[in-house]
């Protein structure tokens, strides 16, 4: 390709000015002509290069678009999967919350029943203890009253009875016992 360009410039430089065509180095005078020549040379000799360059660029752009589209599809699938997992986790969390509320309610009812039962048992035990202590106190008071009554009766009988009266009471009691016991009983 460089050989072609060199040949073209060589031919153009050998042409004389008298022939009407030549290479003018004054940019301001021949700018359009020079540009047309350069573009013509570039289009004819560099066309394949530019076409292949543009095709490579087009393929790279298409490949980038396809890659981006694939990544978008993968991201969309992952997003959908994550949303599904989130919804599933949300449902499970709601179920766990409902179950925990139900369990807490059942435990609360169970504990309240246990508290009621324990309270009833404690009240029953309290009442039984009070009744036992009352019976014990009443029994103790009875024993003391009986002991005091016997002691007092004994003291009174000692002070009132003399020997003669004692013999008489003893005979009377023996007589009463004798009537109660019949000869067949002995």
Swiss-Prot record:
GO CC term (a single one): proton-transporting ATP synthase complex
Keywords for the protein's UniProt record, in alphabetical order: ATP synthesis, ATP-binding, CF(0), Chloroplast, Hydrogen ion transport, Ion transport, Membrane, Nucleotide-binding, Plastid, Thylakoid, Transmembrane, Transmembrane helix, Transport
The keyword Cytoplasm belongs to this UniProt entry's keyword annotation: no
Protein name: ATP synthase subunit b, chloroplastic
InterPro entries reported for this sequence: ATP_synth_b/b'su_bac/chlpt (IPR002146)
Family, as annotated: Belongs to the ATPase B chain family.
Transmembrane segments: 27-43
Miscellaneous remark of the record: In plastids the F-type ATPase is also known as CF(1)CF(0).
Entry's localization field: Plastid, Chloroplast thylakoid membrane
Domain of life of the native organism: Eukaryota
Annotated function: F(1)F(0) ATP synthase produces ATP from ADP in the presence of a proton or sodium gradient. F-type ATPases consist of two structural domains, F(1) containing the extramembraneous catalytic core and F(0) containing the membrane proton channel, linked together by a central stalk and a peripheral stalk. During catalysis, ATP synthesis in the catalytic domain of F(1) is coupled via a rotary mechanism of the central stalk subunits to proton translocation.
GO molecular function: ATP binding; proton-transporting ATP synthase activity, rotational mechanism
Lipid bilayer topology: Single-pass membrane protein
Oligomer status and interactors: F-type ATPases have 2 components, F(1) - the catalytic core - and F(0) - the membrane proton channel. F(1) has five subunits: alpha(3), beta(3), gamma(1), delta(1), epsilon(1). F(0) has four main subunits: a(1), b(1), b'(1) and c(10-14). The alpha and beta chains form an alternating ring which encloses part of the gamma chain. F(1) is attached to F(0) by a central stalk formed by the gamma and epsilon chains, while a peripheral stalk is formed by the delta, b and b' chains.
